[in-house]
């Protein structure tokens, strides 16, 4: 069983942390992953830097740009991660846009993920139908879970279709805006979380966009299995460095 599925079966709320590989410094990637696991994080999303990240807010965009300037590439990321499973047990997901994966070669990328011990991918600009028709078989051959995003605007019919194609969790976008732009959830968002919960989907949902502290984590996990923190974590790295990871995580739980 995939590590993601094993983790989702645990009787606890899931905290997933996102960061941009190669930020703040090019060689921080492994240290950040190891420190996050030691701090009690359940799952990690490793951002594959891209020059045009459409869904990302300014904090993640800036970290992605800096990572590229630092010299991060897809090839280098896999090189950095080649021994990661000797020290890290929790699920690892690569989140990135489809262009760099296409350039690398989808088959080669998935093969490298499997060799490295990556458990899943989140590719915001890969449509579910294109995935199902052209890439699902390749992903599954290499043991990879593919995670799709849904928003408050996604129809119930579309959500059920995504649920039928998915085999891990569904990334529940808390609003239709970019990442890092919210500070708490209003009644409309809370009702949206509740509505999705009441659909009784086969895949659990994890909420992203707008979670930045203990309060918003608890709000997000009232109806869903877990929550993802990205912008707030990167902001903390920028201001306080890698040594602050344990303190940051301890203030969420």
From Swiss-Prot:
Pathway: Amino-acid biosynthesis; L-tryptophan biosynthesis; L-tryptophan from chorismate: step 5/5
Domain of life of the source: Bacteria
Any Gene Ontology CC annotation: cytosol
SUPFAM superfamilies the UniProt entry points to: Ribulose-phoshate binding barrel
Top EC class of this enzyme: lyase
Residue numbers annotated as active site: 45 (proton acceptor), 56 (proton acceptor)
Keyword hit for 4Fe-4S: no
EC identifiers of the protein: 4.2.1.20
Keywords on record: Amino-acid biosynthesis, Aromatic amino acid biosynthesis, Lyase, Tryptophan biosynthesis
Parts of the chain that traverse the membrane: none
UniProt catalytic activity: (1S,2R)-1-C-(indol-3-yl)glycerol 3-phosphate + L-serine = D-glyceraldehyde 3-phosphate + L-tryptophan + H2O
NCBIfam families: trpA
Protein name (record): Tryptophan synthase alpha chain
Designated gene of the protein: trpA
